[in-house]
Each structure stands twice: as structure tokens, then as C-alpha cells.
Amino acid sequence: MFHLRTCAAKLRPLTASQTVKTFSQNKPAAIRTFQQIRCYSAPVAAEPFLSGTSSNYVEEMYCAWLENPKSVHKSWDIFFRNTNAGAPPGTAYQSPLSLSRSSLATMAHAQSLVEAQPNVDKLVEDHLAVQSLIRAYQIRGHHVAQLDPLGILDADLDSSVPADIISSTDKLGFYGLHESDLDKVFHLPTTTFIGGQEPALPLREIIRRLEMAYCQHIGVEFMFINDLEQCQWIRQKFETPGIMQFTNEEKRTLLARLVRSTRFEEFLQRKWSSEKRFGLEGCEVLIPALKTIIDMSSANGVDYVIMGMPHRGRLNVLANVIRKELEQIFCQFDSKLEAADEGSGDMKYHLGMYHRRINRVTDRNITLSLVANPSHLEAADPVVMGKTKAEQFYCGDTEGKKVMSILLHGDAAFAGQGIVYETFHLSDLPSYTTHGTVHVVVNNQIGFTTDPRMARSSPYPTDVARVVNAPIFHVNSDDPEAVMYVCKVAAEWRNTFHKDVVVDLVCYRRNGHNEMDEPMFTQPLMYKQIRKQKPVLQKYAELLVSQGVVNQPEYEEEISKYDKICEEAFTRSKDEKILHIKHWLDSPWPGFFTLDGQPRSMTCPSTGLEEDILTHIGNVASSVPVENFTIHGGLSRILKTRRELVTNRTVDWALAEYMAFGSLLKEGIHVRLSGQDVERGTFSHRHHVLHDQNVDKRTCIPMNHLWPNQAPYTVCNSSLSEYGVLGFELGFAMASPNALVLWEAQFGDFNNMAQCIIDQFICPGQAKWVRQNGIVLLLPHGMEGMGPEHSSARPERFLQMCNDDPDVLPNLQEENFDISQLYDCNWIVVNCSTPGNFFHVLRRQILLPFRKPLIVFTPKSLLRHPEARTSFDEMLPGTHFQRVIPEDGPAAQNPDKVKRLLFCTGKVYYDLTRERKARDMAEEVAITRIEQLSPFPFDLLLKEAQKYPNAELAWCQEEHKNQGYYDYVKPRLRTTIDRAKPVWYAGRDPAAAPATGNKKTHLTELQRFLDTAFDLDAFKKFS
């Protein structure tokens, strides 16, 4: 009866585990590897007695039949026999018959159904076997594709060979098929295109076409994608017979591009054989591959391509893809060339480039930008993505149809660097997506000297891309036409679905890691084979000559023509005496600087605002500008507090930030704030995105309701990534100087997760690449007893990387000294102690006539501190950011009586003033706050030191002595006063960890350094 009850269930498709047994069972080929399945021609409902109302009766009849088949009517006997034999219910049931001669014949026919069923089973199972075989090729065909041009290793490191698709009789046996089945014709499923216009094919032809599609020089990984339309699209591109065809003109273009790629490297080798250039030998096909992607994208409407790549083949890409003048490249090899620009410059294979030209294939304008990068592999990936996102944003390209990115990778780095994973996970996030990136992996099967088997645990270096359902196309780089086809498909995929795609160029490296390196030390067998390997240009030229596409003289003429171009450029390069790094800018800002790249002025206007603007922004910040929007009760109280502040003409930290952002939006400046939990704020103080408590996912951003024609405000919670997201925001800030781009760390302690971006891009970016950037880092910092991972943004590290000289007092009489200082520094480091100063420094960041990175150590406890308030009076027109906030209490009235002048920065000021008040030492101890640490305010601090002639000087900080600001401030203070006095220290003792995890210890340390700061005899023993 169970069988009858489950008739409907048997209509469902069988799972893979139900249909195919594992090959390891080693069953004889004749034994079926499929469970029996019924091919129903009528629905179960054809049997009226199988309804729920009759089930009890049917069960009784079935039990009786099991005990004695003769105990039930003959029609029941036939029905139960047919059903158990697998006949469909509509066929199994026979109406009760009379005992006429015709009735007996009909009954005999019904009885014969049972005997005929095995033939039906075989037919069904054979078709299922063929469908499973097709699916096996689609899923695992890439494992047996001929991808390695050297023929040494499989491109994947998976030691198991898919036995069900290898070219042997095992293939048939695995699916229960025989040699005799090879010429049988099978209907093709809808999930394959190998038939073209034919609905059925012989098994032999099915296998041949599958092997042509999936097991030649292209390996396709796509069946993990969970979108049927996308899978069908890929199947159609690779399975359709004859789809990979090229015209003779396309073949000649491909040959010409290979000539340029190959002869460029050979020219460099001839002229500068002992120079490092990280040549492309062994993967010369990369150049035509990139040009194909760009051609296809241009044809689809893309007019701006932003690229990122490592050093391998970079000069070739600059020369033959971006089309940088060859003489500008060649002159970089001249050791006598002088650098005319400020800054230190960088190696030629790190430089970027920006170029606008006509694409000759599509006859359309296209802009190409190659982003400069350090040697830190893959570090430029998120930077490229951020720049791409920004360019899309500024031109209103909401679908990525005009601007796109191409990222090049090495196989070892693509598998080994975590930033690749972080970047992939930004690809589909609404505020970070670039609507698809084409990734090209130069898979030369070695990482410097490391074998792939020691460099990754995954079969392919590209397996990381599977996490975002990106299709992966592996291709043998010694088959240029296969490479071109794959690149066309990749560009079409990106244009169609606006998702990432990976092209894995399986190639080799003809030389060592660089031209001076000896690879035979570590890869002797591989390099013996490489020495025998015929270059891909020679192979392809011979193929085209044999096909009659070109003749030998035409081929040789193409070579000599490009060689002549190189020689002429080499001659011109000798005339270059000065190296202008600015010619290698990857992100020019038209109109922002003068024609020679200088600021249009060296002044900064007031950063204050009219009171009506402050009031208007404050009112919007304390309201909900959308009707029928229910906010949380706790948020209502926060907005009420904001309204009271505005009424009282004061701001707290959150309101000061709001006013800075809102005023810039009014001036047409886009503001983008990104980071973990920034919409609400880690400390629940910001609340820039309001959530309706009654409607799911309904939100409101009041900042976008300030003015009728304001610039848009973007605030976006990021993924839990620092390295990737900070790199992304840096790239976003590269695109335009007229945007305030901020990244906020959840806690300042976590900025070191993005240390590479800070050390290699933000700090030295202008010095290396003459590229300014105005990104702002907001780093919550403060010793508040929260333990070693929630206390310190490591200010000592940022200050240690500042480029000013601690031992040289600058010319304090210079006109606009403060602005000149800002122009000369590599970044600005501030620690504001008031909301008003925070407001001013954010506005100054945009009003300056140039751009510098801004590092802000933001407070935590000050966000709600009752004394951390600023009056509107300090934010009105005529007010500025205060680099130093001097003492303004009783000590300032009688400076001669002051016995100690304490210098400090940030939150510790409030601890010091509280302690000073408790000790009643307001006339004896003056406290001066240094708000801008770098560039150091020598001029203002000199005035402060001179103001208190009888006071001893001390630096006070809450951080440990070997951390914080002391080592940076002390030598500069000493230089300021011409070393006339010592600069004493009041703060925590040196320590390995940034802070204690014990609350009592924290408070004890705090009181100890406060005692030192106000003990006027504390330093006498050292005098």
C-alpha cells in the first residue's frame, strides 16, 4: 500500500544521488546505475479510486491481494501486478471485463504490460544516462581540458580525474551504456546547445561535441551559478556548433597585436638586458586579450575603462593597450634622467597612466586609466573598484554601462592574498558595486620560485571567485583564438549581466621572476620544457600562413614595421633630459590646478557659516522630513536633545558633523561616509539613517532633504572589512577633488587591518605618484578602560610617518605660513577637543586649494560630554579651524605667575581641567591644546611658550610613553623654544599593550599621571 500512497511522489525528478551510483562500486557495466523510474503518460488522478475517500478500501483490497491474489477480482489483480511492475496508474488500471472472447484478449494485453516494462525502463534509463553524461561535461569538463601550454601539469591541482568523462570505455560503463549504444540517437535535453538546430544526435556525436566544447583549450566553470538564465547563456556561448569562428580580418588583427606584444618585450631585452622590467614573455597573448575585452566593451557603449594590474607585463600594457608614448617609457630606463617634479617618484613598472584616444575597432572615443600601485600584490584591487564607482557616480552611470573596470592578477597572488576575497565581497553591495569587473589572471603556474602545489590548497587559483557566482573561463594561452573568444564572451557577460567574470590565462614565464633571476635553481624540469617551447607568435604565424590568411612576407613586414616604430621612439627618448612624473598621472583633476599643476592660490577662506544656515541644518537634523514615518522612541529623545541644542545656539559632536556635511552639500560638494556601522554610528550618536519602526526596510536620510538643489549625501554601512573598504574609499576620493570622502573605523584600533592602504597609498601617494588625495580617516580613540583593542588608534604610527623635520624650525615669517605648511606635508593629523573645531577641519578639507589626506582621532566619551559643546559664535563667518587652543582662564591673565605650562591634545584636556579645578591651581598651571599635530604649529606654540616665561614645560597624554604623541611632540617643542628648556613628560609608563583590560588599573594609572601633571615638584629631581 505504501507503493500506492507514494505514486504522486514518484513523479518528482530524482536527485543526482538517486540516479547515478559512484564509480568506486566497480559494478559490471551491464548493471544499471539508475533506480527504476516510471515514465507516466497519465496523471495519478486517472484512477478515481485513489482519492482520499476510497483509500481505506483500496488498502484492504491490497492487503488481501498480498495474502492471496485470487481472493480479489481479476481487475484488482491486474492493477496491483501492473503497479508493482512499474506501470503508470492510468495504464495499470483495467476496467472490469466480461468473460467474452474479446475481453479475454484485452486482459491478456494488460497482462503483457508487465512483461514489456523492462524495455521501457531501458529506454528511459538510457536517456537519463545521456542527460547525466551531458551534465557531467558541463560540470567537470574543465578538469580534463588541455589547458597547460607546457603539457606538464594539469591547470588544476585536483589529483582525482573525473572518470565519467575521460576518453575511455569507462565513460560508457559508468553510465550503464555500451559500445552498441554509440550509434543510437538520443533526444537532447533543453539544458544543452550541442545540437544546434538538431533536436537529437547519435551518442557518438554527442560525446564528440561535448569534448569539443569543454575539453579542448577552454575549460568552463559555471555550473555552480544558481541562476538558470546565466547558465543557459554560457552553455549557448560554448556549446553551439561552430560558434567560435573568426574572420580572416580578425585573425590578421590578432596576429598584429601579438607582433606588438612580443616584439616590444624583445626590444627591451635587446636594449636593456640587465634591467628589471618584469616582462610578459610566455603570456604575450595578454595584450590582444585585453584589447579584445576593451573592443567588445566599447562596442557595447563603454567609454571609460579603469585598470589595475601588478608589475608583470605592465610596461607592455602601457605601450600597447593604453598607448603611452614609447619614448616616455624608454626614457625611464635612462639612469641619468633627472626628476623635475617634487616627490620621490616610483619604479617604472609601478606607474599609472590616463589616456583618451579613439578605439580603432569601434571608432569610438575611449578613456583608459591604469591605476598606479605598489609592489604589494592585489593591494590596488579595491582602489580600482572605488575609482570606478566614483566615475560611474559622477556621470550618472547607475548600471555600469559607461564605466567599467578590468583587474589583472597573478595566479599566486590571486589565491594567496586576502584582499582579493574582500574585494569580491564588495562586488554586489549596493553602495560598492561597480556592476561587474572583468578579472584576467596571468596564470604562469609559479609564484616567484614557489610551485603552485605549495602556494594554494584549492584546485585552481581562481576558486575564490566562486563565492560571488562569477563564471570562470580557463584557457590555454598558446591558443590565441581561444583566448580571444573567451575574452569576447567575458566582455559580453559583463555587459549582459553586470556581474564579475574571470578569465584564467594558463601560460608560463619564459624568464625568471625578473630578468636577473635564475629559475633553474628551483624549477629545472619546467624550465627545460620552456626552453624548448616555441613562442606563441611563431606558432600562430605558422598557423595563419598554412591557412593562407597571411603569407610569410606580410608577417615579416608587420614585424619590421613595429621594430622601426620602437627604434624611432628609442632615438627620441635620448632627447628627454628630465622625467616628469606628472605625465604619469592616473587621475587628473581638470580645472582644479593651474596648467603647470600648482594650486590656484595659497589661501583658505573662513570655514564659518551664517547663523541661519546653521539653524536650518540643525532643525533638519532634529526632525523627520518624511510624513507617516515612525521612529524609535529612544531616537525621539535624541532628536529632542538636538532641538534643544539648536535653540540654545550650541552643538555637540554629532550636530557639528551634521552641520559640516550639510553645508558642503549646499555648496555642491558630494559627501560620502563609509565604514562599519556608520549609518547609526558605533556609539549610537550619528543616526544619519532613520528606520521606520512599522515598515520593514523603509528608511529616511534627512541629510538628503536639506536644500532643493543640494549635492547627494551617501552614507553606507560597509562589509566587515577594513583593508578592502578603505582601499575602495581611497579610490573613490581619487576621482574628484570636489567630494568629501570619509572612512570611519568602528574603533580606531582596527585601522591596522588596513595598514597596507595607509602605508603604501595614503601616506606616500603624492610623493610616489604626484597624486593628491583628500580622503578623511575618522579614528575613534581614547583611553577609557575598554581594554587594549578598544582604546588606541595608534597615533604614534601616523605621526612617525609625517614628513616634517623635527630639528628644523621653519620660516615662521613666511606669508600664509599655515597654508604653506599644509601644502608641504604628506598628510594632516588632528585631534580635536571641541565639536566646533571638528566642524571647521572638515570644511577646511574642501575649502583648501589642494588636497591632503586628513587623519582625525575622534573621541568616544566626548560625544556626550556636557563640556564638549561649541557655541554658534565660534562657527560664524570669520571663524577658522584653531590649530592650537591656548589657555583662556586665570593663568592667561597673569602669565608671569604660571609655574607650569601643560601641552596636551584631545580628550585628556577635560581630565586635566577637572583635576586642576579640584586642586584649585587655575593660576599656577596653564593648559594649551594642540589640535593640529601635523604639520606641527611651530608658530603658535612659540607664542605660547614665550607667553609664560617662568613656567616649566610638560607634555601630558593619557597614552603610554612609548605610544601616543610624546616622541613626536617633544623634539618639535624643543626646536620651537631653541632647546632653552626641557620638555617634561606626564603620562602613563611605557607598555607593550595600548591599554590595560582592568578597570581599576586604568583608573589608578589615570590618577597617577594627573598627580604628576599637577605636582609642581615632580620634575625637580631631574633638573
From Swiss-Prot:
Entry's transmembrane regions: none
Catalysed reaction, written as an equation: N(6)-[(R)-lipoyl]-L-lysyl-[protein] + 2-oxoglutarate + H(+) = N(6)-[(R)-S(8)-succinyldihydrolipoyl]-L-lysyl-[protein] + CO2
Binding site for thiamine diphosphate: 312, 411, 444, 446, 676
SMART domains for this protein: Transket_pyr
N6-acetyllysine PTM positions: 401, 970
UniProt-annotated binding residues for Ca(2+): 143, 156, 158
Family: Belongs to the alpha-ketoglutarate dehydrogenase family.
Protein's name according to its UniProt entry: 2-oxoglutarate dehydrogenase complex component E1
Originating organism: Rattus norvegicus
Gene that specifies this protein: Ogdh
